Amino acid sequence: MACKYSTLIDSSLYDREGLCPGIDLRRHVAGELEEVGAFRAQEDWRRLVGPLPKPYAGLLGPDFSFITGAVPECHPDRMEIVAYALEFGFMHDDVIDTDVNHASLDEVGHTLDQSRTGKIEDKGSDGKRQMVTQIIREMMAIDPERAMTVAKSWASGVRHSSRRKEDTNFKALEQYIPYRALDVGYMLWHGLVTFGCAITIPNEEEEEAKRLIIPALVQASLLNDLFSFEKEKNDANVQNAVLIVMNEHGCSEEEARDILKKRIRLECANYLRNVKETNARADVSDELKRYINVMQYTLSGNAAWSTNCPRYNGPTKFNELQLLRSEHGLAKYPSRWSQENRTSGLVEGDCHESKPNELKRKRNGVSVDDEMRTNGTNGAKKPAHVSQPSTDSIVLEDMVQLARTCDLPDLSDTVILQPYRYLTSLPSKGFRDQAIDSINKWLKVPPKSVKMIKDVVKMLHSASLMLDDLEDNSPLRRGKPSTHSIYGMAQTVNSATYQYITATDITAQLQNSETFHIFVEELQQLHVGQSYDLYWTHNTLCPTIAEYLKMVDMKTGGLFRMLTRMMIAESPVVDKVPNSDMNLFSCLIGRFFQIRDDYQNLASADYAKAKGFAEDLDEGKYSFTLIHCIQTLESKPELAGEMMQLRAFLMKRRHEGKLSQEAKQEVLVTMKKTESLQYTLSVLRELHSELEKEVENLEAKFGEENFTLRVMLELLKV
């Protein structure tokens, strides 16, 4: 199993008693993101739930925190929210340890059950429910399917923990272990690991996964008890293996600890045997193998963290930055981890056999292998283009010989891909990928085809954004400089066009030849729709609402319609529902998405940070809100003065290419007079209701509920 995000460290520096023999200790390169997530959770707890010690001893560690060692292959873009969720678990666990009767387990469980059904309602909820809602929402924005796994497994764990009041009288270690192995937080931990590492265990292998993981659960739970006993032994609700062994054998604490250490080493050996045997099996999926391999680092990471973490070893174990963040907050000491690093594989290696001196050589932080790219001509790997001083001979005979040589070294696609790679590196909510995954709950398109369709949609969407920003002269995209402002107009156009060509090539490789016709048809429609948007802007012509909606259907809705039609063409269950049955959903989601974008451009502070204040007015776009405003002004003679002023502003924008802040503020004042923003919001809410109804209709036609699609719609609600 390749390791992308971690490096090997010397386990003997931490696991001095050899509690995890045979398992490497790895350290995540983005441990900073874990600490940010933990401190954010602490700040939210104090704000929403109640007081918390400063500094709080949850998952933090002085050299590395818990997830950094226990999930060293967590995707960097998921690290912060995984840490937030686990820190919430630590804080909630401390409440249970203090007094299980005041832990509000039913409230947390109710919220998790809500998220499983696609409805997230936090109005009037208590602080812990609000935090759980926040966790699920953030995870849904990254990976809806695996976020649902987190919600389901966590809800099961909460229900298990609620039995603590009944299961307290354990007479023997063997009686205690089955309960404790689950209570160690396995259900939550299972969800967080599969989400963090993007693992999906097939349904038919879930029971086998539980069977294989049992030795790891026993080892982790007993090791946790070993290190936490000093902290817990005076708690009112203490349940700990050290105490149980002392009572069972009538021995001292030290003798009980020795008994547990032997059992911990035994269970570690049992789990390593399971790992080895699973890797050799041909009857299980690669995803199950990856899960079993990833879980071994829970053991080594947990052991190393437990030896010096503040939670078990006292407050002197916090490092300087942790103390500063605890005292002054994240606002003063924010993350030092760049967004570019969050989305890139940083280290290449092998999780089984790599040694510290065997890690791949790095050049400016990039693996040497990453500097090799397929050139797009014959599939051969050639070095990426790097400008170097010319060594060509200027002797005439040599130049003639060079001119006669056809087999010259290829130029790679690195240069043409740079603008595209820059755009796709910017923060994105991944809505279209989420839509494809959600719709595929019904259509059952094979994974290979799903990936190809996702790639096509990503390329087309990204290329259209590059060209849109250029055509609109937008300075920002997602809070960063737009592509053309960095690479120039010519390179941006060339890179975007290359994506259209590459997407065409991928589409031609899909199983059903009909997908190619769908692709061409919808791509033509998309460009025709864009032509009207540009035409109205250039000529300062206000379309009717019907014309605007038709333009949206062709442009924004076209991409949604394309992906649904292509998925239906590739679906093995297409006979259940004809193509036309998905048309209304595609139409509604396209219109909702565009009108929502129009509204947020004028009303959202977050949108202003990402794209600039009221940027649509700078671009001269006739948004839904502006069209309503103009039509309302034209229908009311008493507002003739405001209409003349608005026309003057629009003409000024055409000549100067933008509007001043003061002019945009005046336009917004006029929109308030016509109640255009409120009207837009009302239309959005009605459209959202229609979308929910259409999902119900589709659920009835397919005979299958679609919770992930419902949650996705819930997250889009304005």
Curated annotation (Swiss-Prot):
Keyword Nucleus set for record: no
Binding, Mg(2+) 1: D93, D97
A UniProt-annotated Pfam family: polyprenyl_synt
Annotated positions binding Mg(2+) 2: D93, D97
One annotated GO molecular function: geranylgeranyl diphosphate synthase activity
UniProt note: domains: The conserved DDXXD motifs as well as the NSE/DTE motif are important for the catalytic activity, presumably through binding to Mg(2+).
Catalytic activity of the protein: isopentenyl diphosphate + (2E,6E)-farnesyl diphosphate = (2E,6E,10E)-geranylgeranyl diphosphate + diphosphate; isopentenyl diphosphate + (2E,6E,10E)-geranylgeranyl diphosphate = (2E,6E,10E,14E)-geranylfarnesyl diphosphate + diphosphate; (2E,6E,10E,14E)-geranylfarnesyl diphosphate + H2O = ophiobolin F + diphosphate
Cofactors required: Mg(2+)
Range of residues in the leader sequence: none
Keyword annotations: Isoprene biosynthesis, Lyase, Magnesium, Metal-binding, Multifunctional enzyme, Transferase
Region ((7Z)-ophiobola-7,19-dien-3-ol synthase): 1-320
Organism, as annotated: Aspergillus clavatus (strain ATCC 1007 / CBS 513.65 / DSM 816 / NCTC 3887 / NRRL 1 / QM 1276 / 107)
GO biological process, any: mycotoxin biosynthetic process
Binding positions for substrate per the UniProt entry: D93, R180, A181, L182, D183, N224, S228, F229, E230, K231, E232, R311, Y312
Locus of motif NSE/DTE: 224-232
Identification of the protein by name: Ophiobolin F synthase oblA
